[in-house]
Amino acid sequence: MGRICPVNSRARRLRARPGRPSGDSLPYHQLQGGAPRLWSPDPGRPAAYRRAHVCDVTAPRWGSTSRQGEGAVLQRMLGRRAPPSWSRDHAYSRRGWENAALFLNRKRKQEGTENTSICCRPESALACGGNLSPQFLKKVIQIQTQELW
């Protein structure tokens, strides 16, 4: 009789790793990656290797046992650089800029240099929301006549 639900043969293959008898196998999520364990799914390989996005160049994550020479470490480090988008799209995401702005404002408030209604320089008029009150203009003129810059 055929099964009612089709068997996911790939999943079953992944679950039964070659290193152990197929009966005792860890669930897939524990095989994902992480700290090196004492056993290794198959003896030729270090225990914890990342399966996420690793190309074959970087595959032995924790350094292979055979040292091909002193240059090997450096080469592996150079090869491991992620494609630039991974690191970069965090740095310049909209959220990142917003967080930076909020953080700066908070710092300025603590130092007391944030824009209050009386600004010290005419350039910052727009930073005050453009509220050009008579007091503000008076202050600007006063500063300009003193010629402090």
UniProtKB/Swiss-Prot annotation:
It comes from the Eukaryota. This is Down syndrome critical region protein 9. Residues 1-41 are annotated as: Disordered. It comes from Homo sapiens (Human). Testis specific.
